[in-house]
């Protein structure tokens, strides 16, 4: 068993915690960082995670986002408010982590997507991330508090819920006035289907294209969503993501 680590989060937090400011007066303030402290912060957090799985002595794989993001081609506004530069030492920490850890960065993908692809290509590993988006990926998820097992059906449902609820942090709005709780209530009443999603968007004066855009932005990639030969994402379509209804309300509209 391997631990698939969302290292973006860990390294960003570690480097930000090692920053300090020097106010030179007048109009000059500089930001400085102690590299050894940033590395110590990272190693501390990785050790804490590994300690949670000591009985299995797992290997760790650290996943980082690429500097380019395919979602920005779909929607230029995606994460548009996240323009702050990375904290001091961020790139150097990643470079040094490669010495002792396996590090994975996939072209144009976020760390979430790379973890989703790896986890579905190699079942039996555990994703480590506090990001609720990872509830889309079937398998084990450790959110830094608890470990849960997510089924493929639960993952598909969570993607639908996020499509309606949106994510203001990531810059896609979903359906105005609908959050996670209201989305769950709506799906439980109307069924987990693409038609339910489209109707919710249309009821607010939006279109099916708006629904599809939100679904594609919300989707965390799995192996089925990735062209390994061309090394590029396969954009999500409703037909590809629905499942056979087994009494839980997830409906197949592909026929």
Q: Which functions belong to the PLM regions below?
A:
Residues 1-92:
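Domain-level signal for Mg2+-assisted phosphodiester chemistry and nucleotide/NA-binding surfaces
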Residues 28-30, 56-57, 80-253:
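Extended two-metal-dependent nuclease catalytic cores across DNA- and RNA-processing enzymes
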